[in-house]
Each structure stands twice: as structure tokens, then as C-alpha cells.
């Protein structure tokens, strides 16, 4: 009611003001400019009498809401899911009501907002499944370290800003830290160099280092089995430490180093002006001495540098000499079709990489591969075999992965092919339990190769995998080919010799097939 009264007062003031200005000799255009309204509004006030203004204000027309009949549905949905957005509600309305009228998003937003205010339904955060935590015992001295990469924009000496990239590693027992900065994104060679600088700084190396599944270190995945880059694999063998990779997109399983990355961003790099990278790394070493490793740790209540004096005696010796890698990365323009032109060929990038004509990526050629890194995050976004021909488009199907049938349908097709064999069903159940993320990919490999073999061959191959604890579609494929060749050879042998074939060669062949596959 107060709003209506105020509205009437405003209109009365405008009505009197328009007439006052007209009496002073101003025309409609001049009055409009003075009051900040349109000329037609001035004309409307001049044509309206004072009594008519009161009459219009007191008469209220009731308009039927265009979405009024959906009020109960929207109200019930909001009461059950108060965190739902107007955009999602719009989609649900179209899904539940095929005859839902064509209205703009703003109309639905206003309607949902009106119902929230009418029934007092506030927008709450979505209830998430609570994750259980427990305090783990401290790891032994010298056993574990955790490593990760970070980046941040910082101001530069001559004005503007630039992004710096850094490698962080922390010894999990003493919380003793090391960081190394770079102007370019980390690739495998630069990451190895940072590792060696850390080992030199520590005066030794731990037995195991925990990482994210970062493509700087991982070349590809073989249906759940991680294949490391050649240079990083050689570095591991040379330094004799064991890499441990966390589950993808699960930073809470590697919390210590995640906190170090955050600590560097929110403490050391805050308001720090970049002079040059060597200077920044020198400043970082001094910061580690006085703050990062020199102050009492918030969790352990111990000073990392003092604890490190104990842990240092448990580290494995490091005898190497860090050698900085040569600068190899160059900037390349991203085309509208999400490709990069390099040496007369086109290499694909994930859909959506291109955003404008200024989009750039870092490109590096290494070990017969073309690696493309995001200039924004420094992360590797694509890796292709180097093509020696010209005019070719090298495309990664993951960059435009089509929708396909579900994993359950694939499993049903395989079971139909093997007439419901129990061992095949058990193998697929175990595969799903052990590699749920890659379950469908493994089934697709089996499904695609099935038409080339009899069901008895497939059953025997799966039986061998089940017996040896191997859950990998490529292993099944290799074994099917091996069993097929063996049966053909046995058939030919039976024609010429009644002696059974030797089994030692068969076992040796199986071992060769399984070599390189992780049993888990």
C-alpha cells in the first residue's frame, strides 16, 4: 500500500512540475530534457487532468499471469529442491509439459522469483554428500614427498602483468618445502630439472613422490593403466624413486602440497613485482628459509627446518647435477576450428579452446610428438604424433567424442555373444569394480574385436585373464589373437604328429603378452 501511495505522490509531483515549466514558456522537448523524461511522457501529463490521474491510480486491472497455471508445480519443486536455478526450472517445465509456451528466460526467472517471494522459499545451497575424514598417522622419515604445479599472474617491473609458473614439492613428514619458478609452462624436461633442483636443495631424495595425474608426466592412458612420458620414465629409473599418482580431480587426497601451492600464491607472491626469473627464484629461497620452512607449522606445531635436520638422514643420496633444459616452446595461433598449423599440418585442440583471434597456445616438439600447452593454465591440452607429411589434419577423437550407448548395453551384447558365460560375466563385474572410470572403454575394445573370433576363443582368453587377475581390454584382444594362432597351429600339428604341443612355449607367450600391463 505504501508503494502505491508513493507512486501517486511521484506522479502528482511530475504532473505539477510539467505544468509549472510550461507556464514559464518551455516547450515539450525542453521540459523533457529538464526533467529527464521523454517528450511523449510530457505530452501525456499535459493531456491528463488531475482528477483523471487520481482515477487511473485508484483503478487496478488484474492481469492473468502467462505461466500462472504452472504455479503449483513450481512451488512444489522449489519446496523440495530450494537450490534449483530458474534456468533448470525452465528446462524441467519444458520436459514435463510438452505444450509449455515459448517464453524467454527472463520471463521464467521473474515467475520463479515471484513464487519464491510469495511463499518465502529462499535459495539454499545444494546438499552434498558428506565425505568422511580421519587423522592419518605421520609417515616415516624420508618415505614420501608430494609434488604439484601452480601458476599466478603477478605485476612486472616495467608495468603490466605476466603469469609465472612454479613447481612445489614438500617432504610429508617434516613439511620441508622447495619451489622453483619459470616464465614458461612446465613440460617434462623442465619438470625433471625442477625435481633435480629439489633433490639438490634437500641433499637427497625420498623413496616415493605423490603426484596428480598431470599430462606433463603422463603420456597417455591405456584403459586405466598410466603410461608415463619416456623422459620421465627414464628419470625415475635413473633416480630410483617410485611415483604414486592420485585419483584424477581429487585434490583432497594430496592435501599437503595443495596447501603449499595455496601458501605460495597467498603469501610469497602477494604484491610481489617480478624483476626477472632468477631473481624471483632467489627471493623464493630466502622466503623458504625465513617463512616457508622457518616458521612453526600450523598442523605439526614444529619448525620444518628443525624437523628436516632429522629427516635428511633418511633420504636416499643424490649425486646428479641439475642441467637446465633448452627453451623449446613457441607461441602458436589457435584457428577457429580449434586447430594449430605446424609444419604444414593441422593438429587438433579440445573443442572450445578457440575463444577469439587472440587465443594462443604453447607448442613443443619432443620425442616424435607435438605437445600443446594452454597459455592460461600452463597445462598440456593435446599431444599428437608428429606427422612428416604435408596438408594432413591430425585429430584426437577425444576432442570430439561422440555420444554412444551405455556400458550396460555393451556388457549385455558381450554376454549374448558368449551365451551368458559365467566367467565372462565375473570378469566384467571385477573390471567394473576395479576400473569403474574405464569400464566402458574396456568393454568397447572387447566388443569391437569380437566379430573376428569365435566365442570359444573369447571365453578362453577371458578365462586366462581372470585366472591371472588381468582386467584390460587390450590384454583380452591380444590373447584372442594368440589363442587363435595356437589353435590353428595345433590343428596343423595334429595332421602330421600325434604328440601334444609343448606347454612351456605357451606359458612364455602368455607372459610376453601380459608384460607391461598392470594387474590392477
UniProtKB/Swiss-Prot annotation:
Instruction: Identify one Pfam family in the record.
Output: Mu-transpos_C_2
- Keyword match DNA damage: no
Q: Which UniProt keywords apply?
A: DNA recombination, DNA-binding, Transposable element, Transposition
Which processes are annotated in GO (biological process)?
A: DNA integration; DNA recombination; transposition
Question: Which domain of life does this protein belong to?
Answer: Bacteria
Annotated HTH IS21-type domain ranges read: 13-78
- Quick one: signal sequence residues? none
Against InterPro entries, the record matches this protein to:
Homeodomain-like_sf, HTH_IS21_transposase_type, Integrase_cat-core, IstA-like_C, RNaseH-like_sf, RNaseH_sf
Disulfide bond annotation, renumbered to this chain: none
Q: Which GO terms describe its molecular function?
A: DNA binding
Instruction: Please list the residue ranges annotated as the Integrase catalytic domain.
Output: 136-312
- PANTHER family (alphabetical): TRANSPOSASE (PTHR35004:SF6), TRANSPOSASE RV3428C-RELATED (PTHR35004)
> What's this protein's function?
Involved in the transposition of the insertion sequence.
Would you identify the family this protein belongs to, as annotated?
Belongs to the transposase IS21/IS408/IS1162 family.
Record NCBIfam families: transpos_IS21 (NF033546)
Name of the protein in question: Transposase for insertion sequence element IS21-like
